[in-house]
Amino acid sequence: MDSSRELSGEEPRSPSPRHETSKMRLSPDRPSHHPARPPASLASQPLRPAHYQDDDDSYRTHTPPPSQPRTKGFSIESILSPTDKHRKSPRSPPMSPSSPSMSSNGYSEGPIYGSTRHPLSATVPGLGRAALDELAAHRAAALHIPSAALPFSHLAHNPAFYAWMHGASFLHYHGMPAFNSHPPIAQPLTNSSRLAMAKDISPRPTQSHSSFGEEGGEKDSRGRESPDSEHRRNNGHEEDDDDDDDQSPQKKKKKTRTVFSRSQVFQLESTFEVKRYLSSSERAGLAANLHLTETQVKIWFQNRRNKWKRQMAAELESANLAHAAQIRAQANLAQVSAVHVHAYAQRMVRVPILYHENHPTTGSSLHSPNILPFPMPYPGSYHQISSSTSSTSSARSPTSTSIVT
């Protein structure tokens, strides 16, 4: 191409810096699938040196050495478009920065890839080692942004959000127009921008680091079970074991209830009425007569004594209640009778009753203050005193007869 321009007399044009960077990014171990062969008419012409300078110092041209095959186009689409090898190979899952197979310089080492390989080479296959190192350094610097300044910081552990964030940082670093449609991550976002970004970071059916196995546990890319899922599974088994342990004593404690016949119950009741407590010999003899064990007879007497104590307590309580009710009734009756007596005493009227007889003189003489019923006796007047006494007694009781004459 440069030789044809020299023959035509045109001044050679230097490719843009982006084209030059794209040429530098081509790795030597990946030759192009479309090598350009020089025409036969120009095969015998001598090649110019790799670098030459015209009158203008700003124009420089870089030609690859003759041993390396030359590619046809150096456009962005041809560089960024995946080759046939990458089309056939399956898309590798994005590597997390905390992966154990990631070294300190940003390269992945381990038996998965077989050799040292940059983690971003699968995402951008057309970039060289130097550009990938620079991009890895930029990504490491972007990872040191404080989580409080980032929107959607609660989605940092989401694999889809992680892949979207690093892809957006790569586009922002290279000035791609696809990233300019969204505001920078560190800048405050409006509601519409948040909704748009939420739609972009919605989970898609892509392969992630942790996948759910057939048993329902979380597994990483190597098939090992994550500690959280193992802990939950162990806790579930422990809880099931605890439930089994809790249910096992209940099953052991459950016993069959002994059913006694009517004759056995009658014999036991009659024995209990005679004696509340049995000795060991009496218990053994009763068990032998009833064809029961000593334990069954002992338990029956224990239950019967408990029932008897409950009955006695109930009877005593009912007797106490009846006695208390009787006492209250008597107290109420006494109170009512006292009230009635007091009311009757208040209604009573005292009326003086005079006793009148057919002897008004005697009655008048009794009420006269000058006549005494018993005059003072004097010596020599015994007959007079006796006569006065007899007259007084006859006045009080007319039917009585006088003894002294």
From Swiss-Prot:
Q: Which Gene Ontology CC terms are recorded?
A: nucleus
Distribution of this protein across tissues and organs: Developing pigment cells. Also maternally expressed in oocytes.
- Biased-composition ranges, Basic and acidic residues, are 1-32, 216-237
- SMART domains per the UniProt record, alphabetical: HOX (SM00389)
Q: Where is the composition biased (Acidic residues)?
A: 238-247
Q: Which Pfam families match?
A: Homeodomain
Question: Is Membrane tagged as a keyword?
Answer: no
- Which cellular compartments is it found in? Nucleus
**One biological process GO term for this chain?**
regulation of transcription by RNA polymerase II
Q: Which residues form a coiled coil?
A: none
Q: Where in this protein does the record put region Disordered? A: 1-118, 201-259, 383-405
What this chain does, per the entry, is described as: May be a cell-type-specific regulator of pigment cell differentiation.
What's the family? Belongs to the HMX homeobox family.
Annotated protein name in UniProt: Homeobox protein Hmx
Q: Which organism is it from?
A: Strongylocentrotus purpuratus (Purple sea urchin)
Q: Tell me what gene encodes this.
A: HMX
